[in-house]
UniProtKB/Swiss-Prot annotation:
Residues 198-201 are annotated as: Aspartate. The record marks P91 as: Important for tRNA non-discrimination. This is Aspartate--tRNA(Asp/Asn) ligase. Mg(2+) 3 binds at E361. The gene is aspS. Keywords: Aminoacyl-tRNA synthetase, ATP-binding, Cytoplasm, Ligase, Magnesium, Metal-binding, Nucleotide-binding, Protein biosynthesis. It comes from Methanococcus vannielii (strain ATCC 35089 / DSM 1224 / JCM 13029 / OCM 148 / SB). It is found in: Cytoplasm. Its EC number is 6.1.1.23. Mg(2+) 2 binds at E361, S364. Homodimer.
Length: 438
């Protein structure tokens, strides 16, 4: 007992099939459920890939194995060496009869949370015991799809010639001149947790990298307490040289479309576990201008003036009209960050876009200002001091190419892919205004 010794897993649960009749296997995992019925015991073993049934008939196993099986408790960690026996009446067309069972660790009882999903629990209770919560097949399915999404994105960027980079998360000032920053003590100075890699991405365009991406944490000291906001999030950021905002949107369409196709192909069992109506979007998404979006909101009774950022009610009205994935383009310049390039024919609007899914914004991007003088003027016009951006601005004095890019929220994108209503379902250990543990 409690010793793995020389045993090593030969198969995960989903790899065992009826055609393996008579074959010996070694399985490892947790006791999902146990039933002892006289001279027969049924054990459902759960591992990362699913559930598998083991039958322990007293007349076919030695007495020690049978008695050990009866003493197992829920969530005990075990390994078994047994034989696959084809059986048409069994759930998957086969059973495994253990020849030997080893208990690697016992679980305390009662459990503070039921991983079998038979006893429902509120999300805060589940997050407090996240290590148990993520044993649930549906929760594991969410994070397997998330993993597949990130894998797909890296694959697409690699195929398109992007370089993966890592930018600092300890910064001296705000990226966008805002106040949504977490201050920290940095030796004799004050520093902040990075809210965006934006300025660093642009500096790399001056360095001649042409196309870069980063997948990393961002931190925002927003006091929102909603189902779609977190204070620590994963952002998928990219920047490209010698392109405009339309090229950036096309790249975003390709990244998102490829995610859907890769998930459908590689994660069918997780799609089934979550009972998703998984539809692959078209390769290009519908586009509406900000002005058109405002008209839609007003037509549905939402009070909004041109030039205002979209309210929650406006987003809901527009999302109900559009449905699915779509872009909102040609935003009012005053609503976007200082580095966003105004339209050459009408400086009241700029070359910015948001990618929406129904009422949820999942990505924001734009073509950037690449001329030094224009950027300095725009910073000053916004009431900020250009001296605060000295190292950033210097990159624009020595040959900055035209460039554009975007940031895609990995957590919100996971919400869409897995049809979750709360972003906390899509983050292993979420950080919001109230939650700093576990």
């Amino acid at each position: 007992m409690y010793i793995i010794a020389d045993w090593r897993r030969t198969h995960y649960s989903e790899q065992v099939i009826p055609e393996m009749d008579g074959q010996e296997v070694i399985l490892m995992g947790w006791v999902h459920s146990i039933r002892a019925l006289g001279k027969l015991a049924f054990i459902i073993l759960r591992d990362r890939e699913g559930l598998i049934q083991m039958v322990v008939p007293k007349q076919k196993v030695d007495e020690e194995t049978f008695e050990l099986a009866k003493k197992l408790g829920k969530e005990d960690v075990i390994t078994i060496r047994g034989k696959v026996v084809a059986n048409e009446k069994a759930p998957k067309g086969f059973e495994v009869i253990p020849m030997e069972i080893r208990i690697l660790n016992k679980a305390d009882a009662p459990l503070p949370l039921d991983p079998s999903e038979k006893v429902p629990a509120e999300i805060d209770t589940r997050l407090d015991r996240r290590f148990l919560d993520i044993r649930r097949p549906k929760i594991q399915a969410i994070f397997k799809i998330r993993s597949e999404m990130l894998k797909s994105i890296r694959k697409t960027f690699s195929e398109e010639g992007f370089i993966e980079v890592n930018t600092p998360k300890l910064v001296a000032s705000a990226t966008e001149g805002g106040t949504e920053l977490f201050p920290i003590s940095y030796f004799e100075k004050e520093a902040f947790l990075g809210q965006s890699p934006q300025l660093y991405k642009q500096m790399m365009m001056a360095g001649g990298f042409d196309k870069v991406f980063e997948i990393a944490q961002i931190f925002r000291a927003e006091e929102h307490n909603t189902r779609r906001h977190l204070n620590e999030a994963i952002s998928i950021d990219t920047e490209m040289s010698f392109v405009n905002e339309k090229d950036a949107m096309a790249m975003l369409e390709k990244v998102v479309h490829n995610c859907y196709t890769d998930i459908e192909y590689n994660r069918p069992s997780e799609i089934e576990t979550l009972e998703l109506n998984f539809e692959i979007p078209e390769k290009t998404f519908p586009k509406v201008t900000y002005s058109e979006a405002v008209d839609v909101a007003v037509s549905k009774g939402v009070e909004i003036e041109w030039g205002e950022d979209l309210s929650r009610a406006a987003e809901k009205a527009i999302g109900d009209e559009m449905g699915g994935l779509y872009f909102i383009t040609e935003w009012p310049t005053q609503t976007r960050p200082f580095y966003t390039l105004p339209d050459e024919n009408d400086n009241k609007i700029c070359k910015a876009f948001d990618l929406m899914y129904k009422e949820l914004e999942i990505s924001s991007g734009a073509q950037r200002i690449h001329k030094y003088d224009s950027l300095v003027q725009n910073i000053a016009k916004r009431g900020m001091n250009p001296d605060s951006f000295e190292t950033y601005l210097e990159a624009f004095r020595y040959g900055m190419p035209p460039h554009a890019g975007w940031g895609l929220g990995a957590d919100r994108f996971t919400m869409i892919l897995t049809n979750q209503e709360n972003i906390r379902e899509c983050v292993l250990f979420p950080r919001d205004r109230q939650r700093l543990t576990p």
